């Protein structure tokens, strides 16, 4: 009886051992990569310095949940978070969630972003035909050269203040194999003004009564930037000059044959969609800003070509965005719908 019990115990001990070995073997995919299970994440800190925007500190992380790994390299849940900010009001705060398992047979993507920008680029209208003079904003270290270059205005001449808030909720479903439909809603909030020169100058904001000039590296707050001039000349309407809020609706089709969503090594991703964007400015009211309701069409094509196994991939993309109805405010002309 004791021998039978010992033999039974031996079987119970040995069988789990074989099962564990078998499970360990299965934790490698067809390319020899280790299959990830459970929760995985990485953190990347960031430190930077800009002469005008100051010191930056921040970090980003991407958290993935793979469950038992049976669907790897596809994840079950993905949460991306990023926060970075400078001492002169520039940064990004973003949270993004993505999953095709929270709602069965549908992919849900949620994104909330806030981007303060104390010195956002503004080079005027009409693309390459607009006048650009680098001497307007290129500060020279040698004060004698600065005296010769009378064109110099301010390092903030081609800048303006733009804070952007964005929230988006998108859902995707399958029509047939790699062909999918997608729809989404969201809101864009633009808060715009001229650059805060006093804040940007900081300790350099010193005015010398004797010379009637600011400190050598300080920007003169009495000098108008291109944005202020456009408002003054009427090229930028008062109803759009300070920004506004824009709820939008989106719908389209997608073709996706990529082998994986993150870091694909082969396949094609193409989408075509329409976005209808409304406009509202609390100061001027809906009637004044209704002229900025507009409809846009987007087409994007991405192709991933394997060069060496899954180690080296050649990728290229083309895309277009066209306003097909209505008028978009000037600050949204550089925003690319995705």
PLM region spans:
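Cleavable N-terminal export/targeting peptides
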Residues: 1-30
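Hydrophobic, lipid-facing positions within transmembrane beta-strands of outer-membrane proteins
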Residues: 41-43, 57-59, 91-95, 163-169, ...
